[in-house]
Amino acid sequence: PVTKPMFWERMVACLLTTQQRSGPNTAVSRFLRTQPLPLGYEACARQDDLGEVVGKVLANFGGLRRTTTIARELSANLTYLENGGWYPVLSHLHEIILHPDPETERRAADFIDEKLKGFGPKQSRNLLQGLGLSRYETPIDSRITKWLNEFGFPVKLTANALGDHNYYAFVSEGFQRLCEACGIMPCVLDAAIFSSFDGDQWTEENAVW
């Protein structure tokens, strides 16, 4: 089962990787490999002013962007979770474990997108992927659209429109249908495309998840 600390740390990772480089040798990856994680759940839950603490921790680490925004988002998300949000969030994730299918994953991703600050269609699926719960609903970004265009997707795709929920759903559905026709799970093809862009830079030592 997904625990609160596990969910929280993956959520922190998702917010940190938004709009900034997160390859194996970046500041984001170095921060997330820090043990224990400076912004772990137990440490954050006992803060009276989480936003201020997060801002200082991220700024002092250095090399990280959007520190003020991330601080505000984490503070808002903790408030939501601690005031009744944990139950529906964890229930959606538990439902995926019980019924692993595209619809269940999509409902969970949409719920996260709706309820948590800093999350859109891509990062909500990033969170599911980080928790090991995403088989069908994968994070789609410019790498995926570039690969699909080169592969011969029937419609010319642009990553700039992926923030629109309907457009994202359209691309995701096409990606899943392609995978079904090829007899491969979407999460596997996603990983293959991802690694083809980063080469062999990721190792067991520098992996974040």
What are these regions (language model features)?
Residues P1-M11, A59-I70, E180-I184:
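Structural motif
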